[in-house]
Amino acid sequence: MSSEHLNWKSRELTESDDNIGIHAFYYGLGWQKEDFKKPQIGIGTPLHEINLCNMHSYEIGESVKEGLSEAGLLGYRFGVPSVSDNITQAHSGGNASLPSRNVIASSAEMVTTSHRFDGMIGLHHCDKNGPGFALALMRSNLPGFILSGGTIKPGCLNGKDLTIQHVYDEQAAVEVGSSTKGKLLEVVKHACPGAGGCGIAASFNTWGIAMEAIGLMPPYSSSNPAEGDEKRAECKKAGEWMLDILRAGKRPRDIITKAALSNATAMIGASGGSTNGILHLMALATEAGVNFGLRDVQKILRGIPVYCNFAPRGRGTMIDLFKMGGTPMLIKHLIEVGVLDGSVPTMFADSLAEQVADAPAIPEGNDLIAPAGHPYKPFADMQICFGSLAPDGIVFKVSSRLDPTFEGTAICFNDVDLLVTAVTEGKIQPGHVVVLRGMGPVAMGMPEVLVATSALSTPKLDGKVAFVSDTRVSGVSHGAIGVHCSPEAAVGGPIAYVRDGDPIFIDLLKGEINWDSRGVMELGGEFKAYSGSQIYLREFANSVSQANKGCVNKSLLSND
């Protein structure tokens, strides 16, 4: 793209006398004559003041806008809806979380393409923000990237760091009588001290480090804290990055290849990341038109050891990574140990290895990133299984188990509250495979059921039961968890037919999950598409694909 035509799209409006009425609006914005030849960049801003993850998004957007201006570009913030994955936990509001990702993608696509922007920067604040903007970039293929709003700093109580995970773990402890409400209240008051996304390897940070590994997020962006000089400096540099991208003529679809998606998968596995990251990668591959599915993910994760000790599997936070040297340091290490392919191009460099070349080496004796040849675990916490219970796949995360096999009998629930009650009443015992169904994308938007996994994380059950569901879990969850079971119950998937007492066999390294129906096939309840009063959920249910395709719009899929 020649330097004089960096406004490659907006010039349709700014350099044509046929659009004189539009020019009147531009002059009303305070433009001068020279502004009509400047590239216009949309800044996707998920405004949401009541959510800690997003409360500073307007200020982050303003800093990005200033950086674009310093580079001779015109930056304009535009708003998209955002749903807090924490505030919507444990009630029907959680049904909005995953649909919000698709709404963000459509909103950003609509605004940027209709206004003829020359590029887009999407701000990643809460879990579904960054994935939504990434999908929008695949659709429009506009020059651009995702920039993280930054991670929250840890809270502190009695000299010990706290995260949001401690709140849910303490809540579970109170429910089984091993802690007190007074102690829980103190943890609640001190766990979240300010702005930023959840500070552990939950969904927000999983997507951030995956996007750095895939080349769609600038170096250090995922690990820089939300409140700090580094984040503001990074925002100011956004203009320099965007100008380089425009001059080079780079487009997002140029870098979202099978090799890049493999890198993102390996990064999620090596870091002990969230299952939601895999769901979004499936969506990204589908939107980008890349032939990359759960079978590919299965093959990659089988060969990936766990190199990071982030919570919830360990104790580390993104602030710990930031203090050590940031995400580029981790990427550089994973390239050196053979987990990541350093040759893939990024939006910011000719190769990923070049992008992180100046990053420091991991410190000796640190307790966050394992040295070469000494991983924390020989196989990834996350594995993909197929079989009679999940013909199209299920995503497992088993941070609390070293044994890759599990055999147990089903205990089935069609309601998450009944599951939690069963835990408190002692009905769920070690050896059970807890089946929660009828909560998939078509049934109710595929909400996160952190309340269920928290209930199962008590000392009596943690690592001693398995959890299988057609819905999602929060990235702060831990235990033996299988989610995104495809097909879901609402479309007639086998999970709808499991009965209490049915044997279920899981072998993570073989990638198998099988179920013995004992010769009886009868529905375990009434499972159907959402038909309630929320219109956006009806629209989502009518248009959404299954989890193995990333829950994108069905119109993107071929008919075969």
Could you say what each language-model-derived stretch is?
Residues M1-M55, I60-P81, N86-S97, C126, ...:
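Catalytic or ion-coupling anion/metal-binding cores of large enzyme and transporter domains
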Residues S97-A105:
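Well-ordered mid-protein domain cores that form the structural environment of catalytic cofactors
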Residues I104-H115:
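Short, well-structured alpha-helical segments in soluble
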Residues S114-G119, G431-V433:
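Short, surface-exposed connector motifs at secondary-structure boundaries
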Residues G119-G122, G199:
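Short catalytic-loop micro-motif centered on adjacent basic/acidic residues
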